[in-house]
């Protein structure tokens, strides 16, 4: 309770500062003037107009339920083996595991070290010569500029416990900022949209043969949720991140389109995450940690299909939170999101950038169809996946499976 009070008082200080610096009414007005059309209604209209369709070919998402932390390594291996036959991996090739290392806080604020370790071992067993695990931490914890770097993704990964797990499993830790500003290249998406000028991505991606994405299941104060699609931001150099946050009105769409980067389309093979712990409120670094009675491992070749199920799992578990953790101001307020994004622009760029930047408009997430990142992903990834949930060894209770099916089936 004392820690919770301390965090709240710290937040009030940030709000007060933001209110003073950025202008009170302008900062808070989105709490008064609501969106003219909800994301779910906009999605319905796009489907009715033929802009978005439900895919005819089904997308398999593999679920393995585990009740004990000590079983998680085995659960990850079984889920991965069910989701792919690893036919894409040839002996002697290299694999990059994209973790989520946005801060130094432990799982579920960052990727599950047990899961990362399991995947490193499995890929080695399947013939990979090198398994590289990496990310670049968020702007609140790492200031990476052309002429200086303040902070360290390596030290943050060590603090979270992930670094030790990677090294013990035989993986190679890798941190994008350590190569310097010029160790990034310009990649392009395959869709004409918000990234026509390209994205600055780390050179390591051009050198590896394959990519496995291992996100976590978390709330995100700005984007709504931090799942697989949102993890793409960790690749980007600071100047790309500045564009992302500066043009806040399209932040959700830019998130989705970032996953159409040509390197990712060519090399990403699998998305796998664990949901035995969820950062169920606020996010991406802090919030209420919820531990379900049964934890899910979610694996799929399709990042969109993975995120649909992962978001359903997050939303389902948010209904089970203690009453005092549901509907809190800091978790649901559009003003908090607006201020948070404005501060991110200031950290990434300048005070002037923050004054001129677009204001983020956050919406509530009640159903997966309320998520603007996913809704745009349906448009650019060929439609809404027809999700088929594969219950590995019947470990997922039928009632839970039925609930998830209903949540991800578009009607």
Residue ranges and their predicted role:
Residues 2-411:
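N-terminal and secondary-structure boundary signal
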